[in-house]
Amino acid sequence: MRTITHWIDGKPYEGTPIGRFAVENPGTGEVEAELLQASDADLDHAVEVARRAQKEWAKVSLAKRTEIMFRMRQLVLDHQDEMAKMIVAEHGKNYSDAIGEIQRGRETLDFATAINVALKGEFSSGISTGVDIHTLRQPVGVVAGICPFNFPAMVPMWMHPIAVATGNAFILKPASATPSAALLTAELYKEAGLPDGVFNVVSGNRTMVSKVLEHPGIDAISFVGSTPVAHIVQNTGVTHGKRVQALGGANNHAIVMPDSDLDFAAQHISAAAFGAAGERCMALPVVVAVGGCGPDLARRVKAHAEKIKVGYGMDEGVEMGPVIDAKSKEFITGLIDDAEAKGAEVVLDGRPLVIPGHEKGHFLGPTIVDNVSLESLLYSEEVFGPVLAIVHADTYEEAIKQVNSSPFGNGAAIFTNDGGVARRFELDVEAGMVGINVPIPTPVAYYSFGGWKESLLGDTHIHGPEGVRFYTRAKAVTTRWPSEKTYAATMSFQREE
C-alpha cells in the first residue's frame, strides 16, 4: 500500500503520525493509499521550519520572487497531465475537468508573476514642509491554507502563489481525501527554486486543524469549505489573534426569465448543475423559473442532461464522474427522497445509475427535480451533487425574493434578454459573484473571489487585489530630511506652512 507523507523543509517528512487515513478512489471504491496524519509535534516542526524560512524569504528581491513564480507556472503546465491523473484517482472528476481545474488555478500563478506591480505602494510629497509619506506592504509571516476535497489543485492555487510571492511562508493542509496534488505542488516549487521551508504540506484530522487555528506561530489562515466549519475557523482563529479569511458553503440560484432564449439557458444550466458532479461551490443547484417557463425549461435541460456520459474519469468520452464517497452519495439521495416526499416531481432520476465494471464506485447520474417545495431540504441545503432543483415564481419580484431568502450568497445568475431586468438583478441580488446569462460567474484571477452572507465570513475575498491585501500588512512611512533650515518641534496637530 502506498504511503503519502507530509512535505516539510523541502523534502518528504513522515514524523510521528497519530494515524493513517485511507485514500479511496471514488470511481472504483478501492483504497489506493494511506495518508499519514500529523501529530502536534509534526505541526510544530512545520511551523518552526516555516518561520525560519520566511524571515529570509521576505528579504529576497521581488525580481527573484517573480522569476521563481514564472518557473513555477511553467512547471505546473509541464506536469498538468500527471497532476490531473492524481485528481481523477482521488476526487473522481473526469480528466478534462481535472485539466480545466489546473488551468484555472494556474491563472493565479499568472497573477503572482506580476506581484511586483501588485505591491506598488503610494507616495505623497510635501504633506508638510519638507515632509513626505509613502506606504509599504509587507508579508504577514506564516500562512496556513486549509482546503476542501473538491478542487485539490485549484483552491490551494487560489492561496499559495500570492501568499508566497508576497513574502510569506505557507503551510498547506489539503483535504485528506485528495492529498496528492499538494505533494506534487511542493515538489514543483522546489524544482522552481523556492527555498526549502517556504512551502510545506501537512495533513491531519480535525484535531490537527484545531491546533492550526490556535498555533501561536501561524499568523494568518485561509480556509475554503463548509459554512459550519468556516464559523469555527473564523471564531477560533480571530480569538487567537490571527488574520482569517473563511469562505463557506453555497446554494447558488439562477433566475430564468420568460423572455430568455430557453435552449441557451438550458444548455448552460445543464453544464453548471452537473459539471464536476455538482461538487463545486459555484455549481448551480437551484433554478427559479419565472412566468410559466418552468415546464419547457425542465424539458430542455433534461434533453441536454440525458446526453452527459457518466463514468470513470479516465475513460474516453466521460463527462461526469462519481461523487467523492458513499456518505456523500447517501446524503444527496436523501435530499432527493425528501423533495419527492414533499410533492416534487423527479423529471430525470440519476439514483439507479450503475457503471458496468465500476459497481463499487459512488456514481449518481444527473438528476432534475421540478416543483420543489421551498420547505424541502433539497432547496435549503448545500447539495454538492449532480442535482438540479427547479422552483417557480410568477414575477421577477417574487423570484428575487426567493433568491435573497437563502442564507448563502456565493453566486447568483439571471437569464434574460431584457437589459433593464438584468441591471435590476445585479443591484438587487445579495451575492458576491453575479452572472448575467453566465451561470457560473467565477471571476478571473486578477479579480477577487468571494461571496456574501454565510458564504464568506469576514470581509476579505480570495486571490486578486484582495488576496494581496490579505497576505500583506500596510505600513505608512513619514520622512523628513533636515536641511540648513531648522524647524521647531510642535506638540500640536497643526501642519507647518
Residues of each region from the PLM?
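ALDH superfamily catalytic-core signature
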Residues: 228-373, 436, 485-487, 492-497
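Rossmann-like NAD(P) dinucleotide-binding subdomain of oxidoreductase/dehydrogenase enzymes
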Residues: 121-264, 393, 458
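Residue-level signal for inorganic ion chemistry
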Residues: 29, 65, 87, 109, ...
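Short, well-ordered beta-strand elements within core beta-sheets of diverse protein domains
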Residues: 32-38, 52-59, 145, 254-257, ...
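Structural signal for hydrophobic packing residues in well-ordered secondary-structure cores
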Residues: 54, 58, 73-80, 84, ...
